[in-house]
């Protein structure tokens, strides 16, 4: 199976620190999977699906925030940590190897539904971006004010703080369009924070939520 992933990595619900989402670009995120199904019983209505999936989970967003936990990198390489108010651009580009374990139900000869869990290992990671048109309060919301205006930006990079193992739930449908060709749609919803437990710059958990759509060859 091959397809694309469309979605984002987001806190749920949106915290008060995020005042608005100003731009969103899912970018091109590809997935490739091989799986097998074992039908059970005489009627073969129920089955179990497992396999291996290579996938990327990407997005680029712009948001307006207030008192948003941040650690920026200055032009001199020094890091400033505190609360940011202003614009934030975020780029997420993560590559995983994923093993789903799903229960399947055959609705008819062409259509089947499936749901279950998945576990993923992060192979290549990026969570970075920059801040713009705003100010940083060093330390906390009452700290010294550092302004960024007139096109000035400061970068940040939390890639090394991403968790290597992830898990979540998955549900979707497969439709057999032709004898050997099927199309599919799967929703995957992460259930653990993408950041490591000891990472506290961003003060809320973030979860990957993506829709995979594509086609597959059935043997």
What positions do the PLM features span?
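A hydrophobic membrane-anchoring alpha-helix module
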Residues: 174-176, 180-192
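Extracellular/periplasm-exposed beta-strand and loop segments of Gram-negative cell-envelope proteins
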Residues: 8-27, 57-95, 122-166, 192-210
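Outer-membrane beta-barrel transmembrane strands
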Residues: 91-106, 162-168, 172-174, 183
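Outer-membrane beta-barrel architecture
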Residues: 31-37, 100-102, 172, 214-216
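Outer-membrane beta-barrel "beta-signal"
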Residues: 175-180, 207-219
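Repeated loop/turn-to-beta-strand initiation elements of outer-membrane beta-barrel proteins
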Residues: 44-48, 110-113, 179-185
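Outer-membrane beta-barrel strand-turn architecture
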Residues: 38-42, 105-109, 177-179, 219
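Transmembrane beta-barrel strands of outer-membrane/channel proteins
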Residues: 2-6, 50-56, 115-121, 185-189, ...
